[in-house]
Amino acid sequence: MSDALPLLLRAARGEQVERPPVWMMRQAGRYMKIYRDLRDKYPSFRERSENPDLSYEISMQPYNAFQPDGVILFSDILTPLPGMGIDFDIIESKGPQINDPIRNLAQVEALRPLVPAETMPFVGEVLGRLRSSVGNNATVLGFVGAPWTLAAYVVEGKSSKNYAVIKAMAFREPEMLHKLLNHFAESIATYLRYQIDSGAQVVQMFDSWAGELSPADYDTFAAPYQRKVVELVKQTHPDTPMILYISGSAGVLERMGRTGVDFISLDWTVDMADGCARLPHHLGVQGNVDPGLLFGTPEAIRVRIDDTVRKARGRRHILNLGHGILPGTPEENGAAFFEAGKTVMDRIGARV
């Protein structure tokens, strides 16, 4: 086991590294047969993600198979909700279901402050075990959902195509929505601090549905609360790198760069060179290979990785997909992605 700090952590902190570190969003999941076999045995997603033995085992599956530079906690962005008094389930093929969607002020005011050590001790246990297992051979990543995206789920009650319910709240009862978003910002910051204290070395905030907002509404309902989370976490953990990801972020990329995070994770609809040009140079970039490319050939994967790394040259860069890996992706192409990422400098030359 190496004594040097892991590659991804060094890169995230801005050190000169020999190659871009590589991991994949949703790298533990349905494209892996070993995961599907475990899912058949334990069909409840909440059991898989909240039983510490199962969560740890699933988190380690891609590490054991592919040795990525990052090992991310197997969990869900909705996992902290019950600790605030919001029950949920995740139905296979349907996605999240909120049992009692939040639609009035009384429900917002009844939400509890999040105390992760009491309501989610399994998260801390898994992160600690991951750190012990991978040592300095990989970086342990934690993650959360951002306030707007959590609010979208709990107000809509499920995934949505047009977000009409939460947008109605935003434009008819904005004070109520701001109260909900503020509660989530404070709770999510508490949750991130807990993850870092438990072993997470780098953390990512997913605002998956902020791309559904106009730039002006992003400035009103998403960015201030992303910024609040970052500020609260940085007060106590200033040296922990933070990554922000939004799906469909092309219209708000510059705005993302003003939230205080250290890295912007680009989706694949933004050319890496364009993304780098649009963001301040002090910010790192993550991404951004189209996950659909992993249905192609290993050669196509190599070519795209080479192109992505070339375009990010001169920046702090973490190689990743532009979205989570898709179910049904050939497992051997997941392996090809990691192999091509680790050998990219042999093909394009020079240090990053």
From Swiss-Prot:
Pathway: Porphyrin-containing compound metabolism; protoporphyrin-IX biosynthesis; coproporphyrinogen-III from 5-aminolevulinate: step 4/4
Origin superkingdom: Bacteria
Organism: Synechococcus sp. (strain RCC307)
First-tier enzyme category under EC: lyase
PANTHER family: METHYLTETRAHYDROFOLATE:HOMOCYSTEINE METHYLTRANSFERASE RELATED, UROPORPHYRINOGEN DECARBOXYLASE
Location(s) in or outside the cell: Cytoplasm
CDD domains membership: URO-D
E.C. numbers: 4.1.1.37
PROSITE patterns for this protein: UROD_1, UROD_2
InterPro entries: UROD/MetE-like_sf (IPR038071), Uroporphyrinogen_deCO2ase_HemE (IPR006361), Uroporphyrinogen_deCOase (IPR000257)
Name of the protein this chain belongs to: Uroporphyrinogen decarboxylase
Key word Manganese present: no
Residue intervals passing through the bilayer: none
UniProt similarity note: Belongs to the uroporphyrinogen decarboxylase family.
